[in-house]
Amino acid sequence: MKNSPVKIELLAPARDYETAIDAINHGADAVYIGAPRFGARQAAGNSVEDIARLTEYAHLFGVKVYVTLNTIVYDDEIADVESLIAELYNVGVDALIVQDMGILRMNIPPIALHASTQMDNRTAEKVDFLYRAGLKQIVLARELGIEEITAIHKAVPGARLEAFVHGALCVSYSGRCYASQHCFARSANRGACAQFCRLAFDLVDADGKVVVRDKHLLSLKDMNRSAALEQMLDAGVVSFKIEGRLKENSYVKNVTAYYRNRLDEIFARRPEYVRSSHGVTRPQFVPSPAKSFNRGFTNYFLFGRGEDIASFDTPKSLGEQMGEVKMVMKNYIVVAGGSTFANGDGACFIDDDGHLQGFRINRVEGDRLFPQTMPEVVKGTLLYRNFSNEFEREVSRSSSPRKLRLALSFTSTVDGFALTAIDESGVEAMLEVQSEKALARTPQRVNLLGQLSKWGNTPFEVTDVKVLFDEDYFIPSSLVADMRRSVCEMLLEKHRTEYVREERSPLPDGLLLSEKSLDYTANVANLLSREFYASCGVQDISPAFELTPPADVPLMYCKHCIKYSLGWCSRSGARMPFKEPLSLVVGDGRRFRLQFDCKKCMMKVVAE
């Protein structure tokens, strides 16, 4: 028997209701959004009422709504979390993205749970454990390569694997970063990351010699895996996740539309894959991720350690490379290159000291740029466009609603007429009305077809309409309009009542974890989490860093390696011309020692 096509999900971020709607209208199959509390982005919380409105719209198209509760929970918050989860379940949320395993022992409804990347999901053993615990969709660690993803899929074929494809990168393995808590009392595991990794540092050796001065040595480029989607599909990824719950609407529209196009191109060639939702989206611009915020792009270890992934010069957006400065005059700059700027664009460059400088372009005349204020730029400097005025206008105007394609048939009955509608998701409605059947004096078929096709400001658009009788009856336009409106309401009601959510199975008996002890990186912050792990056979459980900070332990665990970025990778035979240990020093004098575990290809950051 032929296998059914694999349903593939494009998962887009949303900081609020409006952004979520924009994501859906630009091609998302699912959206993830923050709850009022307990999400990994404190600045991106939303009311339950807004989430309820979102689910009603999303479910029309089979789009799923995931809510992020991906932080660790304290004991005095458990009752609030239980109450919030019940509210979210009651308004139709499809799943929660969670970090704290204590949630599995809470008194909550059977809402589906997904394992956040904050759980540090990078081994088949970990994924299998979570899957057996009832978390059917697992967000993989960003650092995993194609071969590792393939191996996990083969080992745990039932688990739905979710992987990031685009957006900002955390330098530490997610869930294992304690730098923000240590330095600023703001826990990344509590949704309050202070972005320690985007700071500027000096790199000094054991003798105090400055190796690198004032660089963003932990700041990474942004992920862009758009060229590798097919390989990821074949490795077993079924959910493609865009990072960015703090990003503005234009970013989400642009990146979502771009990945929608790329995936649809693959589906057209590969019928074994299909999108998981329904509806036509028509962005009113040509998507281009290079035109939205980015620090430069990397596929981030997807095919091993090759290209450098760091963005040492700046943690800010570079945008798209446009050309090289050919000449600097008193009040304008001449640029060589095939790309063109426009009035109102933002431009930037890296100066001789390695710092990012920017300026606004007031006027463009051919290859001449007239800045609002002349920057200190020299001949030969590469220019980037980090704000495209024209593109941003196009994206902001793009508001075309999503539509379900609809096939209609209009038939004659014994005592009237019937209108049947079936949309692309398979939802069907039929209405019969009694009506006098008088023959028309003039041909009516063209007018009837036009009346039947007028679905206007509804979620439907007619792509096929058939009038299945030969007689030319006079049918009042008001009757056709009433039938059309009634059938529309019937379709909408069926979408509301027939939508089926996946529900979580009860926690199984006899679930065991191979580890017998867990250190602070397990992030156990409440009694329920401790009880969960104890029930799985764990005997020694350390408290979370946020509760009892252990001394002299790594604050970060990174696959990014500063020695590799600087050309001193010992695994490739290179020698470092400075004495170890190396340390990072921030502007206020605080120091952080670097530990290099070359066998595991990992760099650790430890406070001195």
Positions of predicted regions on the chain:
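Short, glycine/polar-rich helix-capping loops at beta-to-alpha or helix-loop-helix junctions
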Residues: 122-126
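Surface-exposed amphipathic alpha-helical tracts and adjacent flexible/coil segments at the periphery
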Residues: 1-25, 30-40, 50, 54-55, ...
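Short active-site loop/helix that positions an aromatic residue
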Residues: 104-109
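Short, conserved active-site loop motifs that form the nucleotide-linked donor/cofactor pocket
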Residues: 94
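An active-site metal/cofactor-coordinating segment within enzyme catalytic domains
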Residues: 43-47
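Ser/Thr-centric signal marking residues that sit
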Residues: 116-117, 121
